[in-house]
Amino acid sequence: EQIEPAIAQVVDKTTLVSFHAGANDVLRPGYRPENVFPIYNDAVRKLSATGATLMLFTVLEQTGNTGKTADMWAERFGAFNKNVRAIAVEVGAIIVDANEKQFLSDRRLLAFDRLHLNSLGHDRVAQGVLEVLDMPFDPNWRLPLPAAKPTPWLVKKATSVAWFITFALPWIWRRIRGKSSGDGRSAKYPNPTSWPLS
């Protein structure tokens, strides 16, 4: 839905198109890379064919968790990233690799849902993007966060329970019903918006 409006904005190679998609599909129980990768690659080729400068993103493979589930996610996201890197080479896209800086797996950069970046995480990634684009950036983005203070056991457990009730249970319920978290949602900015806002 977003590709055609984006293509309509392309002037030439001075237009930067950033594209990040497919990572949520990796989380689904019925995930099939043989279905997801061709759709992702077709979208990338379509955007690249416009002549715009194209930027792609990988996702974290290691999040600091351990165990069989963490290993499964690492394997899935590793294969996903391999595809992203391969198509980036094919079309000559810029790539922002989330796995180049180990500190990006620091959980303090994540929102409460443990899936998306919080404001600090977004700022770090934004500075990394500016560096990749050879634009002015804050070099401190590369510095790991200070050592975290130990979290009391009870606080950890309470936080995990709150997360499970708020995010995990609704996710499981949606999967059972064959629903997606995106069903019924519309884009925050469905139409092209000038930036900076005046």
List each model region and its residues.
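Substrate-gating cap/lid alpha-helix
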Residues: 64-98, 119-123
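Short, hinge-like loop/turn segments at secondary-structure boundaries
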Residues: 3-7, 62, 72-75, 113-115
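A structural motif corresponding to the C-terminal end of an alpha-helix
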Residues: 43-55, 83-96, 132
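Short glycine-enriched, charge-decorated loop/helix-capping segments at active-site entrances
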Residues: 31-34, 69-74, 111-112
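Oxyanion-hole/transition-state-stabilizing segment in secreted/luminal serine hydrolases
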Residues: 1-37, 61-62, 168
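Conserved catalytic region of serine esterases and O-acyltransferases that act on ester linkages
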Residues: 90, 113-116, 120-198
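Active-site segments of SGNH/GDSL-like serine hydrolases
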Residues: 20-24, 45-78, 99-105
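Charged helix-capping and loop-helix junction motifs
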Residues: 33-41, 76-81
